[in-house]
């Protein structure tokens, strides 16, 4: 029975590693937007799944690992990585609940980090039992990465044409699309099955090196071996490297360039004259790249924005050094502190250590920084190790460098794969076997702790998923995804019924109220819409979008003074947003007035 349990648990873990990049690569930590749940088997096959299902999978795997596999030691291979990413980081996220004004953000960060912790601990538990499961899991991950590369190619060749056709059909049907949304849809940057083009680029930085080596090894199964390995290597390069450039992520390209440079200059066998020549060439290449960036597109705006994020995070650390400002508070505080002219409103500092430090306290930020450094501790050691180990560790290094300027920590697939690669490529299990077996008390306490954590994560994830499902039902009623449903909208009574379901499962959440309020405004029911927005403001007071909505209602009702007061409140909360300027706002009001008979 125990052997059967081990096999089932191991193969379930392997399946999850295959599914990670394919189904669990979308963006988490965004309670404003509900997850998309598949309606049937066909939809389940073609779309990504709600990322919070990873908590259910992690809880089941952790519980099964504790029941069927022997308890590993923290000094076992990968134990330090598992300690930081599986246990310390989830615990470090808890102080962020203390000052959090937004209940949704507090909940979603707990769900996110405890779910990832359970999955990472289960992977460490299984990996510690032997090399076999490491090998299977890494190969399954490589197969999943290959599929994301294929999907990236499909998007680049056909996907954007489909988007253009969709916009054309919606316009013909009379459905209004905002200019900002249209620009985002038509921006031909590949994101495959991950949340965005930048996070997809970061994921490729992480997985291309190890996946290339593993896919090349697949060629050994076919004769002639040398020709097969050459073909498999070419296939891996063709399917994985071009999508990295199709993302048009300049930060990812820079990280790949810098990581490659560090690798080159740390090779002791390369003559010094070659290193000096490459250093000069690299400086010239970066200077030329800087000129090119400055003269094209957004220029250095993205870079200056990220520096401004870090500035705001540093100020927040001085305001609440021990417990942080609370999860979700960076969004509100940064809008007041930002010094750039853009209207971007980031939810995170785009740096995991800064995110933990400013929202959960400086000690939490130190733990996150330690967790990142733990992944690099083997980078310059064991130069005699296999090509797979060296490739995987340099991929982790490039990914961590990219994570210092991107929201990779919000992507479950990226975080889990980063920790799992480090654990799987740790020294073999022989070192653990040579040490004495853990005592019975240690085994029992480890099993009990793992089962307790698995139960807690399962309940927490299931609770959040129920709320997500209710929120999605409300969104589908308000914003149908097919043209036929858009011409047969749900009745107001049905909308309010779905809203009550959301409130029961996500109490004190402002987002369902705002979504329903927008619907009521579009139908001309301004008084009830105003009531919903006022309730939303009572839950989270620092949202400029709510004040702007209330200003719109006041303007449509002829209360110009009230509209100006709400607009002033929105401008105080987000001074850089041009939508909060009176000139722009009242121009938009004039467009809206034609839709209502007041």
Language model features: what each stretch is:
Residues 160, 164, 196, 307-346, ...:
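TM-adjacent membrane-interface loops and short helices in multi-pass inner/ER membrane proteins
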Residues 41, 172-176, 306-317, 472-495:
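Short extracytoplasmic/periplasmic juxtamembrane "stem" segments immediately C-terminal to an N-terminal membrane anchor
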Residues 475-598:
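C-terminal luminal/periplasmic domains and tails of membrane-associated envelope-modifying transferases
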Residues 1-2, 71-78, 219-229, 431-443:
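Membrane-interfacial, low-structure loops and terminal tails that flank and connect transmembrane helices
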Residues 2, 384-385, 421-465:
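A juxtamembrane structural motif centered on a specific transmembrane helix
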Residues 7-24, 52-69, 85-99, 108-125, ...:
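Alpha-helical transmembrane segments of multi-pass inner-membrane proteins
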Residues 291-307, 442-482:
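Hydrophobic alpha-helical transmembrane segments in integral membrane proteins
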Residues 29-47, 99, 177-194, 304, ...:
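Juxtamembrane membrane-water interface segments that cap and precede transmembrane helices
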